[in-house]
Amino acid sequence: MKGAIQFLGALAAVQAVSATYIDWTQPFNSYDCGGKQCGGRPKFEPPAYSNERCTPQQNTGYDFSDAPDGDLPKYDDFDFSGYKCQKSKLQRRSGRGSGSKCASSYVEPETYSNEIKCGKKFSVDEFDISLEYESVIEFHYGMPDGSSCKHVSKCGTGITPVKNTQCGGAKSVKCKIHKSSQNKKKCKFNIHHIKFRCDKPSTTSAPVPATTSEPAPCTEYSCTATDTTTEPAPTEPAPTEPAPCTEYSCTATDTTTEPAPTEPAPCTEYSCTATDTTTEPAPCTEYSCTATDTTTEPAPTEPAPTEPAPCTEYSCTATDTTTEPAPTEPAPTEPAPCTEYSCTATDTTTEPAPTEPAPCTEYSCTATETTSEAVPTTTDEAPCTDYSCTATEAVPTTTDEAPCTEYSCTGVPTSEAVPTTSDDVPTTTDVYIPPTDVYVPPTDIYVPPANTSIPYETPSPSETETLPPSGTDVYTTLPSVPVETGCPPVLPQCMETWTKITQCVNSGDVKCLCPNPEYIKSVAECVEAWGVDDDEVAKALEYMQGLCAEHIPENPAIVTCVPTYVTLPPVTTGASTVTVSTTVVVPVTTASPEETNKPGYVPVFTTETVIRTVTVCPVKLVTTEPSKPVLVPGTITAPPYVPPTAPATIPATVPAEATTPPVEYAPSTLMTAYPTVPVPVNNTTPNPPIATGAASSFKAFSTVMLAGVIGLTALIMA
């Protein structure tokens, strides 16, 4: 019975593994270094996803209608170096400003003779450009970190809109004639309108009215507003000071000298409730600190002064103190309850004695421990929830307070964690540690060992091989050392950047991404924009074609997205030939170059269908370690990455059709699953959702159904 349950659990683990894969771009796109990729550039920021604040003039766009004629050293927040403001005879596009002025400069090959820069980041959405001669212009954007982004566009003698889809968050932009342009002569370069991407336009705020004597309300991330009333007493009352407030907090305190009823200040989201001076504790809410009302009944002698706890980030304790003549019998107090992101109510003393609060740090504050000189008293612990600390118990002697650290604080002694050893394992559970062998269940289904790659298509069997049962994946072994092909990091970075426009799992889901023309076009433009040079762009796009080779017939953009000025390197071994049918728009004209360069010339275009044969080198994704994926030639078919699991039974032999992998990819240890622990699953990062297109949805559905049947069978057999 036990063996049957273990076998069913192992089979479920195998099925779960078959539905997952490695996100190969993750190591290239880990931003754990302050929002930047460790050792690389920040994540690419397209204008569509930027959040720059714009001036009112930038919100409507620059049309230069209010700029004086002549030199244009500065306009709004920008420095226009090398530009002049002049009149233009060209008709503006609809909705692109008014007037007839433009910012004019010159462009030439190889050098930049103009620059537009700003002291803060900006994102240009679109330029309206006209040239003296039709040319291909390179727009070069300087980024805050010193990197550069560029895009290339062909502009004519009429007003040409130039869209910027890749280079957001820039500090400068300059232009020159691109090397692919037929025109190599220096010519006039006119900007008729600049449209900015403004997701957060700047706004003006109304003046704040003068404050009144009423307590200030508590709002987001604020501290408690406390009213303190001091009633006349035979003895001099102890001075009361409000708690200091720091980041995200402020205490509004009103003090009156006449006894009068007070109402608590209104509290809203993320604030703490101000309460009257009673013996009942004030409630705590999320992101707030407890406002504790303490009634101190002093002895005939003068009471000692009481100082409130300090306020730090996200927390502050405001204490209301009322001094009244009373006998020496101590009054019982109860701690205030603690809730999410709150601090613990303080314990009070039975006699007047100085108390010092525990240090408060980020998201936490330690409940203070007090000294009782008269009668030892204890208090019940206040309930603590998410991100709160524990109320301490009052003891007869003074004790040191436990330090508070990020997200937690414990004021009571805690037991040390005892390291878990193998003695804790039930004696009825067997532990198996194979040398380099692999686990294969007795169903003629070969389960690959723990290695670091992802599944791919089933290779065609040879004449001597036997096929496994229908519906099973077949894998071949990896070479002892995969052949690393050196894919430029710009490709996985761009794939990660633009995956957000799709419904795919992540940038490793190539079977979902490759058929998407918009995605492929955006990635290719991103590679062209952020590639260091043409060689890096060509190499990155070559790998993209290799990754998406099987989808070229259904998505010709995989081939046509390559810029005309970029030449892909020739394919040597392992090449595949794909026939692509594309529709292109080409100009049709018999006019001379002099005529086409005249202002106002409108070219004529026609649509043609082009059929061509493309040779690509398929590329597969293989990982030598879970965090180090590499690209290898497509001739290698790799089994999926499976973390070390706990098989329930151990096979006596390996099926003949399975190939034993080399030592380099064998797991270090394999253990049987404990009865109380669920069957482990493939913990890839990030975990892909269930739905990944039609194929993945079917596999995920079958996995869930199989798991349910297995669980039901296990219960019946048990």
From Swiss-Prot:
Sequence repeats lie at residues 217-243, 244-265, 266-282, 283-309, 310-336, 337-358, 359-382, 383-402, 403-420. Residues 462-575 form the CFEM domain. It holds the Pfam family CFEM. GO terms for molecular function: metal ion binding. This is Adhesin-like cell surface protein MAD1. Residues 452-472 are annotated as: Disordered. The GPI-anchor is attached to the protein in the endoplasmic reticulum and serves to target the protein to the cell surface. There, the glucosamine-inositol phospholipid moiety is cleaved off and the GPI-modified mannoprotein is covalently attached via its lipidless GPI glycan remnant to the 1,6-beta-glucan of the outer cell wall layer. The CFEM domain is involved in heme-binding. It contains 8 cysteines and is found in proteins from several pathogenic fungi, including both human and plant pathogens. The keyword Metal-binding applies. It comes from Arthrobotrys oligospora (strain ATCC 24927 / CBS 115.81 / DSM 1491) (Nematode-trapping fungus). Residues 694-718 form a propeptide. Its main location: secreted. InterPro entries: Extracellular_membr_CFEM_dom. A lipid is attached at residue 693 (GPI-anchor amidated glycine). One of its GO terms (cellular component) is extracellular region.
